[in-house]
């Protein structure tokens, strides 16, 4: 993990909420409950996207709760796993929004993370088969502090908030040089309420180019 993230992590690790959180997760694993993602992949987003290189943040909610899906990046799944419905809808929007985008057969978004897209869930662990089972355990405080740290970054960052949960979280971003893109969640329940046609991926690239940055290659 890069030094800037390491500094933030060390600050959090000294706080009581974080110690309670880690004890909760450790006790879950010790009770033979299956927790996703695996312990060594909980912080993949931070390992792949150094703080100084963050150009875009895509906020998710909590990890996928099926076997072999979650690997520490919001919306992403490991290769060999069928893209879940929300990711399939993200691909559908990309096909309409980005010229030449070809729908992949896999759902691994690592290449986005390596280009400066922080794929951040607001809760970083989940028990197998139980969506939102680790909500209110302390992760929300941790990721609030991540967003507050990102808000302090001098370089402009584009924050992408899909769905009410992410939109509420995105209100932590107040610095005027950042951009926040809000819209409906890509899940099948809400994608037709305005996620399809939102044009966020081309908007991100246009903003990046205006900032003098390279556009994201969304093809995976």
From Swiss-Prot:
GO cellular component: cytoplasm
Protein's UniProt keywords contain Cytoplasm: yes
Enzyme Commission number, as recorded: 3.2.2.27
InterPro entries membership: UDG_fam1 (IPR002043), Ura-DNA_Glyclase_AS (IPR018085), Uracil-DNA_glycosylase-like (IPR005122), Uracil-DNA_glycosylase-like_sf (IPR036895)
One Pfam family in the UniProt entry: UDG
Highest taxon, organism lineage: Bacteria
UniProt keyword Zinc-finger, yes or no: no
Similarity field: Belongs to the uracil-DNA glycosylase (UDG) superfamily. UNG family.
Record's function text: Excises uracil residues from the DNA which can arise as a result of misincorporation of dUMP residues by DNA polymerase or due to deamination of cytosine.
Protein name (Swiss-Prot/TrEMBL): Uracil-DNA glycosylase
Organism field: Shewanella frigidimarina (strain NCIMB 400)
């Amino acid at each position: 993990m890069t030094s800037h993230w390491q500094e933030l992590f060390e600050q959090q690790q000294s706080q009581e909420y974080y110690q309670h959180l880690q004890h909760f997760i450790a006790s879950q694993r010790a009770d033979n409950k299956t927790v996703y993602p695996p312990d060594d992949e909980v912080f993949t987003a931070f390992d792949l996207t150094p703080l100084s290189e963050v150009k875009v943040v895509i906020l998710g909610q909590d990890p996928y709760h099926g076997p072999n899906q979650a690997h520490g990046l919001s919306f992403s799944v490991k290769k060999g796993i069928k893209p879940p419905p929300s990711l399939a809808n993200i691909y559908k929007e990309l096909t309409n929004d980005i010229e030449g985008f070809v729908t992949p057969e896999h759902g691994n978004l690592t290449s986005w993370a390596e280009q400066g897209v922080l794929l951040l869930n607001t809760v970083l662990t989940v028990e197998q088969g139980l969506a939102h089972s680790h909500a209110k355990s302390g992760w929300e405080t941790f990721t609030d502090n991540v967003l507050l740290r990102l808000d302090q970054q001098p370089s402009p960052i584009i924050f992408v908030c899909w769905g009410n949960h992410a939109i509420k979280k995105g209100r932590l971003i107040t610095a005027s040089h950042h951009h926040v893109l809000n819209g409906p969640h890509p899940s099948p329940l809400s994608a037709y309420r305005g996620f399809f046609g939102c044009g966020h991926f081309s908007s991100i690239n246009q903003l990046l180019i205006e900032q003098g940055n390279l556009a994201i290659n969304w093809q995976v």
